[in-house]
Amino acid sequence: REIGLIIVDEAHIVTTWGVGFRPDYWYLGGYINRLRNQIQTKWNKDKKVAHFPICAFTATAVNGGLDDSVSETIISLYMENPIKYIGYVKRDNIRFNISVRKSNKLANPVYEEKKATDLISRINEWIAANTKTIAYFPYASYAGDALRGIKSFAGKTFDRDKVALYTGRNLDDVSTAVLAERKRKAFDEFRSGEKPVMLATKAFGMGVDINNIVNVYHYAVTGNLC
């Protein structure tokens, strides 16, 4: 049976997360190239050169500029003169609210204390209003500190029974099975609304289909915005 079409969903992963998180995406271009350039020899006369189109879809790839992941993906997948369809990227139902804390030196104790205080204040507001919210952290340890109320978050109170935690790291050094069960439980509690606030890293995002999330809070500027 010959291949008629290859569809690559979440195509930005080919050149971003593909290296360490989704290796199948990283090697996909090489596999496609081998399929298209198989050589017939006396030992494999049945081999045929495969001719098929490739469709790649993504909602988050950057087109142009220093972080041009669109061009990188085209090169990685060995796409020749592809036709690009770029949709309307502005989401009219999304509003950005940026809070800037002035400090002579970033990441000093006073600065971190202010950031933590701001976040806890917002968490209490979200819990009181019962608005489903994801608070993203650059590191799993920060998310864990916030939930446990330690380091910059020491002495700050909120209803921890209303807050879930989901990161890609094993913060408590538990078994793989226990960690997987904790993640599943956190996801279910957040989706059902039992815990309306989720403290997470980018590990919580892919494949999450929850249509009533109201707020997405970034504790630090994301890498793509730096």
Task: Outline where the language-model segments fall.
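Post-DEXD/H (motif II) to motif III coupling segment of the RecA-like Helicase ATP-binding lobe
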Residues: 2-5, 10-86
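A short beta-strand-to-loop transition that corresponds to the Sensor-1 phosphate-sensing loop
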Residues: 10-11, 56-65, 137-140, 200-204, ...
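Inter-lobe coupling/hinge segments of SF2-like helicase ATPases
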Residues: 91, 95-113
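Conserved RecA-like helicase motor core of SF1/SF2 enzymes
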Residues: 168-170, 189-226
